[in-house]
Amino acid sequence: MIDQNVITRVEKKYEINVFTAMSLKNILCKTLVQDSYNKDDGYMVRSLYFDTLYNNDYFDKEDGLEYRRKIRLRTYDPKAQFLKLELKQKEGEYQHKYSLTIPKSIAQRLIEGHYEVLKELNNDFADRLYTIMQTNLYRPKCIVEYNRLAYIVKENNTRITIDSDLKSSESNIDIFNPSLSLNPVTSKTILEVKYNNFLLSYVKDIIDSVNKSQTSASKYCMSRFISYL
């Protein structure tokens, strides 16, 4: 099964404290639709990020370049037989996310550096990723994991997420390990607001009502040890 998806939207990030997060959850669960993945306390998101030999994607983000990208494998269950292979590109205020659903066997080959497996998928996006990853010497760099609560509004493809318990590992990149040892990254909670074109007024009012500070912080960059050097 190879499913492809493309999403283009505005993404804004904020840092909030645990008390604000609790208050916001109470409001959102009454006014918006909960994501189908949500459990009582949200769901796990685990990603394996790839970067170039010299960490160009990391430094492009840190330097605030207008055009930058991230490549990752993503799963919501380490035991899952399918994963998302994603390319996120930032162009001004817009984020473009291209994704493929791929079998675990192909994901494992990518982790091992066998990017030629992408050529076997007969998919334009996979061919594009092959060229990027092979030409720029991409390597798996870092596992990033956190807990997510997500709420949606169908109009304008609006999605609000509350991410907490951010953890990472650069020494062990076994994305399939259910008992993976991870290091805490931050105690902060990240609020993300994603939408097409404009934010509906009642959703904007909810976001405006909470204490927050806008940030451009990337979970990937926060999770890399080189960010502390």
Regions flagged by a language model, labelled:
Residues 1-229:
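Phosphate-end processing signature that detects enzymes handling 5′-triphosphorylated RNA
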